[in-house]
């Protein structure tokens, strides 16, 4: 059908594929004709935001992507960094937000499966998983259902496939009601002599389909992930994939065995957009074409048409390009593992994706048109910050009631500082996530150094590897964290995003790890709305600056936009802008690490970093005063670098016995968490002169960057304080000493006026049981 003939589709049919009228006109121009149904579907998924980043690509160009340890940056299935000693780490973060909103168990489970495939497709064995989760208020029954389902899905897939879930974060806020965020990060250690890339090459080389069969599950998942959610989204359950973790375990082993033969030229996971994405991306990256015969594809359902084959997102499937003549060698490996493996196509010289079905051409599209030369929207940025931000920035702590050493009066009732601390510890965002991580197998593979909740970052031991005829013994480990304070980013996307990077690096430094590199997951609302695009643009600017300042290049990641829920009136309610940073760090000696809990009674407690904090954007302000306003703390990167380096070097010198980032809830919450992690009390004296410069609640619960709480053996006090004076000047404070197991957390002024005295038992009850109580378990 020529380009001048009438379109064979109605505007509604075109819109149903996620294609705008002007995009359809561009498709017709490029093809020189109208597309058929299968081709329209292919363009719909490949031109979705989920696949082509048409609104975010110009912003992502700001990110630093190179560095001395970066082996593979953005553009491949996962980033790879050099750990030294012949060890290489692959890592990546991805989202499965929309599927988890309509089918939480399978949505979250297949999110785990998809990110694991990104890792082992590179030739790396998965060694760890982390997750970053966001939900609405835990008092809401719908949130409880989503939360329970997501956690069950993550634990089911990860536990069955045998990869430990070693860390993560969980936030609860009404901003995520109906639109949860499920971001999953995976790490893998390279096992193959060469990193496996995804660009096809070698004209005449066979194209192999391996793994599971193809069905109708996950139809149009990429387009589904690029639209707002509504009450009718439950009807989109067919767009949610169904995973098989036991099959994935076999796929891991078969792929790694196949890669080691040297018979594989390129490999690509069939994730979003399934066969369409894998064929077009492999062809475009290699500057070649791929011809694929759908009649060769193993199916689990009868009567499938090309549109369904091409858009199916059935899980646990891969596409390989093999060296000609060695295809049977690979097929035998997959059959031995009980998996499908067939030659389904060929690499061709013409740079097109040609799909055959029942002896005829079902689709024929230039590969670049699908995977590289896709639409790009450079939107106009607001000339000034939006009104909601300007109003929030006008807030001042002067509007809060007056503080005294006894507490603060809220709505006519005096609340003591002790009561406020217990309330914060009982807040689901701050409280222990033991209800979550007890469902995860976090020790499978026997390389997990810290149990979840025991340190500010996960630490994984690097076991001796057999490769290329030698055994590599090492004391090295990797640390990993996922972080984002979305309230900070909502109130000031630029400063908030910088703070995300700083906190991730700080968490790694608290376990003694040198921050190396970043993978990011950008979760935002609609970029087509001026406020949404302003938030996205400013956050990307902040992330880029933070990564440059802390020398942590970005190796890749994921963009998830249109995270909005339509209310009953049809008005879109966007989530908080949530740029999650996954960061990895290197530990050269696993005997030189520490957790967040106090270790020994009599150890001296110090606060490294700035003493001045703010209540703007704080957990205290949101929880106790029900106010989301103010500006988040501004990041001082010079101080951040110095504080983090002092912490790392203190750990390496065996001076620092515990280290904990002061984050949500401020200093006193950090003190309480260190008491609970070590099951030891503490006696703290806060300088009363500080309260002349700051409100008392700012001193206790204010938040700020570059602040780390550490404990040091009393025998090392003189050496440590000399070191602090040399490297931090006045930017540190001695706070007090660690108590016994039966001691309280006692916070006093320097003239011994009591501010807080609370037992470990009482804190423990609020902190450990907050989530279970709300779930009525």
From Swiss-Prot:
It catalyses: N(2)-formyl-N(1)-(5-phospho-beta-D-ribosyl)glycinamide + L-glutamine + ATP + H2O = 2-formamido-N(1)-(5-O-phospho-beta-D-ribosyl)acetamidine + L-glutamate + ADP + phosphate + H(+). Keywords: ATP-binding, Cytoplasm, Ligase, Magnesium, Metal-binding, Nucleotide-binding, Purine biosynthesis. Its EC number is 6.3.5.3. Coiled coil: none annotated. The active site is at residues 50, 96. Mg(2+) 2 binds at residues 118, 269. The keyword Cytoplasm applies. Pathway: Purine metabolism; IMP biosynthesis via de novo pathway; 5-amino-1-(5-phospho-D-ribosyl)imidazole from N(2)-formyl-N(1)-(5-phospho-D-ribosyl)glycinamide: step 1/2. It is found in: Cytoplasm. It is an enzyme of class 6 (ligase). GO terms for molecular function: ATP binding; magnesium ion binding; phosphoribosylformylglycinamidine synthase activity. InterPro entries: PRibForGlyAmidine_synth_PurL, PurL_linker, PurM-like_C_dom, PurM-like_C_sf, PurM-like_N, PurM-like_N_sf. CDD domains: PurL_repeat1, PurL_repeat2. Mg(2+) 1 binds at residues 94, 558. It comes from the Bacteria. Monomer. Part of the FGAM synthase complex composed of 1 PurL, 1 PurQ and 2 PurS subunits. Belongs to the FGAMS family. This is Phosphoribosylformylglycinamidine synthase subunit PurL. It comes from Trichormus variabilis (strain ATCC 29413 / PCC 7937). The gene is purL.
């Amino acid at each position: 059908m020529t380009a001048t003939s009438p379109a064979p589709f109605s505007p509604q049919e075109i819109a149903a594929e996620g294609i705008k009228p002007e995009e359809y006109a561009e498709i017709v121009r490029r093809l020189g004709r109208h597309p058929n149904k299968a081709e329209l579907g292919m363009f719909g998924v490949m031109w979705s935001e989920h696949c082509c980043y048409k609104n975010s690509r110009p912003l992502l160009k700001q990110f630093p992507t190179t560095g001395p340890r970066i082996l593979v940056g953005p553009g491949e299935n996962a980033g790879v960094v050099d750990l030294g000693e012949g060890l290489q780490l692959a890592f990546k973060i991805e989202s499965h937000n929309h599927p988890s909103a309509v089918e939480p168990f399978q949505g979250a489970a297949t999110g785990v499966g998809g990110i694991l495939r990104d890792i082992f497709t590179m030739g790396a064995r998965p060694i760890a998983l982390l997750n970053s989760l966001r939900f609405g208020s835990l008092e809401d029954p719908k949130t409880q259902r989503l939360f329970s389902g997501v956690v069950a899905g993550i634990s089911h897939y990860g536990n069955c496939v045998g990869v430990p879930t070693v860390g993560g974060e969980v936030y609860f806020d009404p901003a995520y009601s109906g639109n949860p965020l499920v971001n999953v990060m995976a790490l893998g250690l390279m096992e193959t002599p060469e990193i496996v890339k995804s660009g096809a090459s070698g004209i005449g080389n066979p194209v192999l389909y391996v793994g599971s069969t193809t069905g109708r599950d996950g139809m149009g998942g990429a387009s589904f992930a690029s639209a707002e959610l509504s009450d009718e989204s439950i009807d989109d359950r067919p767009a949610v994939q169904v995973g098989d973790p036991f099959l994935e375990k076999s796929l891991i082993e078969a792929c790694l065995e196949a890669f080691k033969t040297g018979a594989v030229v390129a490999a690509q996971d069939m994730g979003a957009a399934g066969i369409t994405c894998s064929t077009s991306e492999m062809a475009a990256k290699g500057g070649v074409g791929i011809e694929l015969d759908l009649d060769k594809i193993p199916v689990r359902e009868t009567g499938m048409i090309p549109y369904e084959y091409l858009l199916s997102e059935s899980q646990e499937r891969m596409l390989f390009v093999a060296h000609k003549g060695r295809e049977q060698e690979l097929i035998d490996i997959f059959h031995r593992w009980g998996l499908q493996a067939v030659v389904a196509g060929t690499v061709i010289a013409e740079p097109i994706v040609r799909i055959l079905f029942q002896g005829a051409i079902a689709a024929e599209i230039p590969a670049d048109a699908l995977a590289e030369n896709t639409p790009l929207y450079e939107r106009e940025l607001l000339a000034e910050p939006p009104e909601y931000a300007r109003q929030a920035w006008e807030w001042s702590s002067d509007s809060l009631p007056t503080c005294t050493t006894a507490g603060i009066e809220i709505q006519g009732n005096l609340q003591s500082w002790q009561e406020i601390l217990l309330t914060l510890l009982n807040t689901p965002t701050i409280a222990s996530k033991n209800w979550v991580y007890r469902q995860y197998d976090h020790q499978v593979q026997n390389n997990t150094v810290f149990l979840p909740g025991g340190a500010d970052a996960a630490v994984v031991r690097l076991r001796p590897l057999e490769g290329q005829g030698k055994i590599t013994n090492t004391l090295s480990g990797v640390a990993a964290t996922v972080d984002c304070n979305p309230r900070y980013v909502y109130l000031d996307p630029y400063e908030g995003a910088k703070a995300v990077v700083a906190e991730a690096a700080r968490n790694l430094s608290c376990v003694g790890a040198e921050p190396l590199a970043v993978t990011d997951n950008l979760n935002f609302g609609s970029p087509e709305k001026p406020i949404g695009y302003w938030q996205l643009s400013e956050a990307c600017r902040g992330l880029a600056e933070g990564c440059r300042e802390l020398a942590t290049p970005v190796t890749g990641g994921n963009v998830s936009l249109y995270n909005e829920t339509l209310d009953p009136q049809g008005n879109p309610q966007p989530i908080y802008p949530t740029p999650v940073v996954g960061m990895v760090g290197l530990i050269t000696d696993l005997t030189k690490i520490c957790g967040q809990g106090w270790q020994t009674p009599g150890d001296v407690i110090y606060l490294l970093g700035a003493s001045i904090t703010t209540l703007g954007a704080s957990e205290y302000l949101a929880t106790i005063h029900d106010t989301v306003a103010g500006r988040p703390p501004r990041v001082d990167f010079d101080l951040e670098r110095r504080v983090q380096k002092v912490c790392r070097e203190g750990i390496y010198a065996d001076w620092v016995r515990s280290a904990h980032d002061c984050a949500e809830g401020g200093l006193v919450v950090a003190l309480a968490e260190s008491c609970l992690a070590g099951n030891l009390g503490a006696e703290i004296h806060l300088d009363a002169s500080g309260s002349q410069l700051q409100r008392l609640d700012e001193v206790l619960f204010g938040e700020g960057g570059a602040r780390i709480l550490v404990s040091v053996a009393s025998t090392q006090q003189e050496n440590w304080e000399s070191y602090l004076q040399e490297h931090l000047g006045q930017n540190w404070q001695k706070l007090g000493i660690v108590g016994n197991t039966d001691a309280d957390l006692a916070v006093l002024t320097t003239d011994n006026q009591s501010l807080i005295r609370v037992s470990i038992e009482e804190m423990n009850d609020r902190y450990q049981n907050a989530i279970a109580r709300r779930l009525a378990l």
